[in-house]
């Protein structure tokens, strides 16, 4: 492998913005936000909309999210429905 051409691979914390569920994983993603994990170390925090904690395929049931979809935002903006 050539040195200096690969992105930095490190541990980051991903947080489901709907449920608040957090998990740690290796990634090349970076963030200015940080969070202290259970082991006492500080890691970059990446917020994501859907994880296995909130996706109906993994949960086996439908969870209602707080975030509106594109259609809902359009309808609110133009006073439809």
From Swiss-Prot:
Keyword DNA-binding assigned:
no
Does Ribonucleoprotein count among this protein's keywords?
Answer: yes
Q: One Pfam match, by short name?
A: Ribosomal_L31
Q: Write the record's keywords in alphabetical order, separated by commas.
A: Ribonucleoprotein, Ribosomal protein, Stress response
Signal peptide positions on this chain: none
List the GO molecular function terms: structural constituent of ribosome
Quote a single Gene Ontology cellular component term: ribosome
Q: What induces it?
A: In strain DPC2739 is induced in mid-exponential phase cells by exposure to 42 degrees Celsius for one hour.
Gene Ontology terms describing biological process = translation
Q: How does it assemble?
A: Part of the 50S ribosomal subunit.
Q: Which family does it belong to?
A: Belongs to the bacterial ribosomal protein bL31 family. Type B subfamily.
* Name of the molecule in the record: Large ribosomal subunit protein bL31B
Organism name = Lactiplantibacillus plantarum (strain ATCC BAA-793 / NCIMB 8826 / WCFS1) (Lactobacillus plantarum)
